[in-house]
UniProtKB/Swiss-Prot annotation:
This is Small ribosomal subunit protein uS19. It comes from the Bacteria. The gene is rpsS. The keyword Ribonucleoprotein applies. GO terms for biological process: ribosomal small subunit assembly; translation. Signal peptide: none annotated.
């Protein structure tokens, strides 16, 4: 179930503040965040966010087609190591 349209999209206030601070400066630094639940706004395009995956911060460069999605969608939290191999070479 999606978010109600009357509420609008969500983004952490601290994240919006950090983006607004960097809009004035020429140098764009990586914005570190733990807010995976924040929606990507059009004002985020061109910025790099370091999104926390539970272990480390993974850099995500925001492009135009990412607008409307959540930051956490682009950083997986689980690493797949493969299924256990079924060793049938050793016979009885």
């Amino acid at each position: 179930m999606g978010r109600s349209l009357k509420k609008g999209p969500f983004a952490d206030a601290s994240l919006l503040k950090k983006v607004k601070e960097q809009e004035g400066s020429e140098k764009k630094t990586v914005i570190k965040t733990w807010s995976r639940r924040s929606t990507i706004f059009p004002s985020f395009i061109g910025y790099t966010f370091a999104v926390y995956d539970g272990r480390k911060h993974v850099p995500v460069y925001v492009q135009e087609d990412m607008v409307g999605h959540k930051l956490g969608e682009f950083v997986p939290t689980r690493t797949f190591h493969g299924h256990a191999s079924d060793d049938k070479k050793t016979g009885k």
